[in-house]
Amino acid sequence: HLAALGALAGDGLLVPVETSVKGVEALVGVMEAAQEYREALEQVDPRVPRSFVRLFIPTKFDARTLGDNRVLEKIAGLEDLAPVASPIAYRPGPHRRATERAVPLQLVGDRQAREEVERLTEEFLQRVVAQDAAREGVLEEVAE
């Protein structure tokens, strides 16, 4: 219940999707939950976006494998529901160290890992936050 309350308190979900068959299969449950969150929010605010998912983030991506590339193509097909970020590469060492130390990846990762986090942040700002600002501007104009 805590996850649901947290989601409802926010503006939507950033959904990490592992670039594996299991990752795509897990999306079914995530999308069902996101729809429930959206319906609950719609009762309070009818201006809720069509999708409660704000950004799909492909994770654990290994560009060298055919399987990961195929799954990434499937994830890209979700663009109609929400923007899809560039994939986050599979880096077991830095990710494990960050988890073990309970610190952000930027503190234990290499330059490439830090650049990926910066790129993801920039994509979020451009594709989600800017879109929200534009939509809010349109809604404010309609209200006037």
State where each predicted segment sits.
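Structural beta-sheet core signal
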Residues: 15, 55-58
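Inter-motif core of Ras-like GTPase G domains
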Residues: 3-21
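Short, charged, surface-exposed secondary-structure boundary motifs
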Residues: 23-29
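Short mixed-charge
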Residues: 36-51
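Short glycine-/polar-rich loops that comprise or flank the Walker A/P-loop
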Residues: 9-12, 49-54, 80-82
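C-terminal alpha-helix
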Residues: 33, 119-131
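C-terminal boundary of histidine-terminating zinc-finger modules
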Residues: 96-118
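Beta-strand-loop-alpha "switch" segments that mediate conformational coupling across diverse proteins
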Residues: 51, 60-103
